Amino acid sequence: MLAQLVQMARQHQISRRAALAGVGGTAAALTLASCSTAEEAMVAATDLSDSEKVLVWHNWAAYMDEDDDGNYPTLLRFQEQSGITVDYRIEIDDNDTWYAKVKDQLELGQDIGADVACPTTWMASRLRNLGYLQALDNNNMPNKVANLAPGYQSSSEDPDRVYSIPWQGGFAGIGYNKKAYKEATGKDAPSSMADLWAAELKGRVGLLSEMRDTVGLVLLSQGIDITSADSLNDDAFDAALAVIKEQIDSGQIYNVRGNSYLDDLATENIIAATAWSGDITVINYEQATDEDPEPFGFVFPDTGATLWADEFIVPIGATHKRNVEELINYYYDPVNAAELALWVNYITPVVGAKEIAAQEDPELAENQLIFPNEETLAKSFAFHSLTGQEEQRYSTAWQNLLLGA
């Protein structure tokens, strides 16, 4: 099961999340990155972890367990146990926009203001190839060595898992407001991408600005095998973009956004959207009432969902690598991994977490969005690994479409 999941994740070569804000800078960053090479090996910053018990963490929204007071229980416990103070910052709304903010410092080998970040697999691979990452030390992460699921233990980009270590994974499908969708369409739930183009939803549909997920879902709906270079070719990609452009131009689409699409669901600016699996759990938690404890739903389109993974990395200029390794080791304890997974509802890469979760919540431990079985994985797909030329062409075309949206 996990071997299949990771193989898909390895092929996921372009951004998971994207926001229209700053998209011009994103395109520029992408162009620069595709032309860059690591001509000289960079030297990692001196590690000050022995004397400075701090670290700064860049992560995505809705990606940490949270209590009613806005605290992060597992992270607070790590700080208490380790004595390391964590400055946890929600800085990544999209891989490319995040990269645009930090690329200048990375190119110079300087501190980007974060000791650890969790970009998507494709971005972690890019940063590694450019020489922008520090190697991690397994001696400081015995839990990672013991509990990293077998399917994750190597990747074509990082065979020995020296530079990147899985954080969480998930699916992209369709999220929707149950009550509003029923009122608008008369149906209980959407079942296909075509349902998003229904006239009853005009102006009330959101799309993720993540190319691999939104375009991927449309490609799947057109019968394209996105795991195959023969099937997912230039003509297929252009045809999918044409469908999306038609829906934008017609006014069917309210907007195209990154993580902030959740705001539009919460305020009912949109009724349905391409969405990330765990996010719908979070918005249900935030918007639940006694009368309606689960106002939002998430479904795989009948033609399949897309799949992605995000990974811990330590930038070349970070000065607290040993502290980060202690953090990673902590989250690879199955008890901590289970607690996190049961809250964020994303796929955990930690062996033993499911068994721990089953003790706490047997029903949730069978949730296919957290612990997917072979049947669920068979319905999810990721882009085949793109060449540099393909990545440049597809990403530029997507960004140009967003600029005109």
Regions found by a protein language model. Name each.
Residues 1-14, 25-32:
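N-terminal secretory signal peptides
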Residues 36-43:
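Bacterial lipoprotein signal-peptidase II cleavage site
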Residues 48-125:
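Early extracytoplasmic/lumenal segment of secretory-pathway proteins
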Residues 110-119, 134-176, 204:
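A structural signal for short loop-to-beta-strand junctions that line the ligand-binding cleft
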Residues 204-210, 214-222, 227-297:
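Ligand-binding pocket segment of bilobal, Venus flytrap-like solute-binding proteins
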Residues 275, 287-343, 405:
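Extracytoplasmic/periplasmic substrate-recognition and gating elements
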Residues 314-379:
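Mature extracytoplasmic/periplasmic domains
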Residues 372-405:
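Conserved C-terminal helix/tail region of periplasmic/extracytoplasmic solute-binding proteins
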